[in-house]
């Protein structure tokens, strides 16, 4: 039996020797590699955090003590150490383990995560709750150096440092978030981790003191307690101490002995402590060590594809931006630590002077875009839908209120598959359609996206373009945007209903119309590529027919709701049936499974239209079609 198979929690860890714990770390790595190879997932970050996670579980008593992950990209070892080994092969699969911490999954998952900037605030909340309720437990926030730059984490550090509560923040410093870290805080950490003079001084002094007969260990501890005074002479700036934290580090994040010793000391201090551990992303797996960014989030890589994938929306956006930049020197691009994921890495290489990676700081990114626009530039902010939520106030107050020409490229809109509930792009249509001055577009294919980008470059006011994580659908005969807000893409000569489809739903709607046509039901499909403002002329044209709206967005407050409201305002008396994502957080699974579960796959759309037209099955549909 392996050591890992004997572990159900921290108490089990404490039965093993240091050498056995090091063996356990290797077993954990191989299990992570085995499962991620088949299921996909976050590989590099998890491989780099194994020793750190084992040490945390060794020192702290979970679930009584609270361990909180920021983002949660590093939680796989934690799951394996808390009784989920036999479920681990279900990672990121429908009905299986989530790829992120999830309170509903285990009592050892103290707080759910998926976005950055949450762990320190929530851990401080736990610590204050413990004091209020007279409970006695320890709180630890594990934060990566990329997420550490996020504004809410800095705000929480500022609050926590003066609290005098027993809160430990562990900085997992692997020198890399999804994209290269940027900014002054990142440079500060670089100085801390690379100050060889401090490391040499500390090592030599400790060795000398411990060798003094009789009093060596005690003298070492006494000197160690005043090390901050020495450190301040050798390391420029005392950012964490100035915030009120006791700073321990930097320490080797792959040395179990050092980790256990420092975490134990932090635990016993009983006040705010920051433990700075330097780790290597992908540690223990050479390909991931050499290219950690490529192994950050990976698809299953033991699966053979039958054909090459179609061009993606992100790649199309990046290529079109490159072409526009060659034509217009005012074009510039902003991203929030996601240059690869949003498809703009090539733009960054070609135009470093016109590319701004602000780190994990979406709020700042939006207002930066506003300032660039006010100054005469043409900014494009490439961001995932789920992360744009963080900049909502800035969209309203800084961009739309001033009617500034900033363009938001909203990728991963709709259902995103295995990353699950925390990463679904289910709300952008709802929170953007009611913002005045803003034009909202949704392409049905990559070619339409390219056309929209070129149109948006010189359009008045703010523009948002949302597109899915999915591969691009095949192009249809696209009419230029200037010649029509909406485009009829599937014509029915004696239409019995019309489908207003948005973006990624256009392809499935057309396939559903083809299927129903074989059953004698005639349904017209409209590509509603301009979601806001709505074209009254098209609403008036189709008001006599039953209208089904299709969107990969929350049905509450989404496109369908806007269509129903506008039809009512125009007094059209239209019958509108909105279809979209239900009022629920959609769990992880494949994108196809999620679409089917929401009734947004071809069969689900056909089923809804048959029911609407009084034909509950294909046989009934043939009878209705003859009427």
Kindly give the residue locations of the regions a language model identified.
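A glycine-rich helix N-cap at a beta->alpha junction
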Residues: 87-97, 162-176, 197-200, 400-412
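Non-catalytic terminal/interface segments that mediate subunit docking, oligomerization
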Residues: 65-66, 271, 279-389, 394-403, ...
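Long, well-ordered, tryptophan-enriched scaffold segments
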Residues: 175-317
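Glycine-/acidic-rich phosphate or pyrophosphate-binding loops and their flanking alpha/beta elements
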Residues: 261-264, 296, 312-327, 343-349, ...
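Structural signature of the thiamine diphosphate
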Residues: 219-287, 405-410, 429-478, 602-627
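Peripheral docking tails and interdomain loops at the edges
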Residues: 301-303, 309, 417-419, 439, ...
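N-terminal amphipathic, basic-rich helices that act as targeting or association modules
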Residues: 1-82, 239-261, 269, 273-277
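Cofactor-binding active-site loop characterized by glycine-rich and histidine/acidic residues
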Residues: 42-163, 331, 335-336, 344-345
């Amino acid at each position: 039996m392996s050591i890992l198979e004997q572990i159900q929690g921290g108490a089990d860890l404490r039965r093993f020797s240091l050498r056995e714990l090091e063996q356990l770390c290797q077993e954990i790595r191989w299990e992570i590699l085995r499962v991620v190879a088949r299921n996909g997932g976050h590989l590099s970050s998890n491989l780099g955090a194994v020793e750190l996670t084992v040490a945390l579980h060794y020192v702290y008593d979970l679930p009584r003590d609270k361990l909180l992950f920021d983002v949660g990209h590093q939680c796989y070892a934690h799951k394996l150490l808390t009784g989920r080994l036999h479920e681990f092969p279900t990672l990121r699969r429908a009905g299986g383990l989530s790829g992120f911490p999830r309170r509903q999954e285990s009592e050892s998952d103290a707080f759910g995560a998926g976005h950055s900037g949450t762990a320190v605030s929530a851990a401080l909340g736990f610590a204050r709750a413990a004091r209020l309720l007279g409970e006695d437990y320890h709180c630890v926030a594990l934060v990566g150096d990329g997420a550490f730059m996020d504004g809410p984490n800095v705000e929480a550090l500022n609050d926590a440092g003066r609290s005098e509560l027993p809160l430990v923040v562990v900085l997992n410093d692997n020198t890399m978030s999804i994209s290269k870290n940027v900014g002054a805080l990142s440079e500060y950490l670089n100085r801390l981790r690379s100050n060889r003079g401090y490391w040499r001084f500390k090592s030599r002094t400790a060795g000398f003191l411990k060798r003094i007969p009789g009093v060596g260990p005690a003298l070492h501890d006494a000197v160690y307690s005043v090390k901050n005074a020495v450190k301040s002479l050798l390391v420029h700036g005392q950012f964490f101490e100035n915030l009120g934290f006791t700073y321990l580090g930097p320490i080797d994040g792959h040395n179990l002995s050092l980790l256990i010793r420092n975490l134990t000391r932090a635990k016993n201090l009983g006040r705010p402590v920051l433990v700075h551990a330097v780790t290597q992303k992908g540690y223990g797996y050479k390909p991931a060590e050499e290219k950690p960014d490529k192994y950050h989030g990976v698809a299953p890589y033991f699966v053979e594809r039958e054909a090459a994938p179609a061009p993606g929306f992100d790649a199309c956006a990046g290529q079109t931006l490159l072409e526009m930049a060659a034509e217009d020197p005012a074009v510039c691009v902003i991203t929030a630590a996601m240059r690869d994921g949003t498809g703009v890495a090539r733009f960054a290489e070609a135009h470093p002077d016109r590319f701004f990676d602000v780190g994990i700081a979406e709020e700042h990114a939006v207002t930066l875009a506003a300032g660039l626009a006010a100054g005469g530039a043409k900014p494009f902010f490439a961001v995932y839908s789920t992360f744009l939520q963080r900049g909502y106030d800035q969209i309203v107050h800084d961009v739309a209120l001033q009617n500034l020409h900033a363009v938001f490229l909203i990728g991963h809109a709709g259902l995103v598959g295995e990353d699950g509930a925390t990463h679904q792009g289910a709300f952008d249509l709802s929170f953007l359609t009611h913002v005045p001055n803003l034009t909202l577009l949704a392409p049905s294919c990559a070619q339409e996206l390219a056309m929209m980008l070129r149109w948006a470059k010189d359009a008045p006011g703010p523009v948002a373009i949302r597109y899915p994580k999915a591969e691009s659908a095949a192009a249809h005969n696209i009419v230029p945007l200037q010649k029509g807000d909406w485009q009829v893409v599937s014509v029915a000569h004696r239409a019995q209903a019309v489908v207003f489809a948005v973006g990624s739903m256009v392809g499935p709607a057309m396939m559903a119309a083809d299927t129903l046509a074989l059953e004698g039901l005639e349904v017209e499909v409209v590509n509603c590529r301009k979601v806001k403002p709505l074209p009254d002329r098209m609403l008036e044209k189709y008001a006599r027919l039953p209208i089904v709206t299709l969107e990969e967005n929350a049905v509450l407050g989404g496109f369908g709701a806007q269509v129903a409201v506008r039809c009512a305002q125009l007094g059209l008396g239209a019958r509108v049936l909105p279809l979209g994502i239900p009022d629920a957080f959609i769990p992880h699974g494949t994108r196809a499974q999620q679409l089917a579960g929401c009734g947004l796959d071809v069969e689900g759309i056909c089923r809804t239209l048959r029911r609407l037209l009084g034909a509950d099955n294909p046989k009934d549909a043939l009878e209705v079609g003859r009427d």
